[in-house]
């Protein structure tokens, strides 16, 4: 009998040791894998940031991968021009050249989501439309309707994109717009640590899916598009995009789930802010702004303050960076700083510093 008990005790001890070893391993693995949750409203630059991580810290994009974006680039071109053609009617702008009415009808007749090629007569129609003085005036009034940020980038380079041997460049890929539906995870290794970056859809309809992502989040990276101070929401014509972004940020930083997560604020699209601030005045949309006009630095510092002031916890530091998600060198530099911040905070969490 004693022999049996001894065997049972040995087995129990072995099981206990196994459990303890597994728990230690789980804790070690949790420390080695850092979960970064990318949050922000639609079109703030989250997907572009993940693409940059793939370029900087991952496998990048092979020629085959690049070819996979060709169709999306074509669709973005049709989508952008169709948005402007619709806006021409809405804003009651006349075409500079009446021949472009026919070109507009041709482009309008296409279902952009089913576009797979970019050939004649569409190339000529697009080129002619983009050079039209009416369309250019319509482009200048883009804050009054929905137009992708990449419209000008693609439409000024139509001949390159329409070439028979066209393959998407990295910049084409970074600028292509495809709304994120569902949750995209991108894991990458850096200095023996696995970073798991999670991108969730920013449009309102996507936000109910976020709840699953809230466990064990090391850091939240919240993206704000600096250029959206004068724009309306995709989902609602009378709501300011930046006000929506502020409301979302306030909700996120007060969630109990994120009590122990560090918060990093990316004030993105600083390049677009620099262009826009020269003709669209911040004070017209945020009357409390009392800084100089046409001053991008003063404008972005004011926007940063607006977001930081939403933090109700004086103990919680909001780490912030001004970014341009389509600029690989800028993101390389910024993420190196972010990585150091996250690692330092993570070591403190595990009492290793």
From Swiss-Prot:
Residues 323-328 are annotated as: G5 motif. GO terms for cellular component: cytoplasm; heterotrimeric G-protein complex. Residues 264-271 are annotated as: G4 motif. It comes from the Eukaryota. GTP binds at residues 40-47, 174-180, 199-203, 268-271, 325. Residues 32-353 form the G-alpha domain. Residues 195-204 are annotated as: G3 motif. GO terms for biological process: adenylate cyclase-modulating G protein-coupled receptor signaling pathway. Pfam families: G-alpha. Residues 172-180 are annotated as: G2 motif. CDD domains: G-alpha. G proteins are composed of 3 units; alpha, beta and gamma. The alpha chain contains the guanine nucleotide binding site. This is Guanine nucleotide-binding protein G(q) subunit alpha.
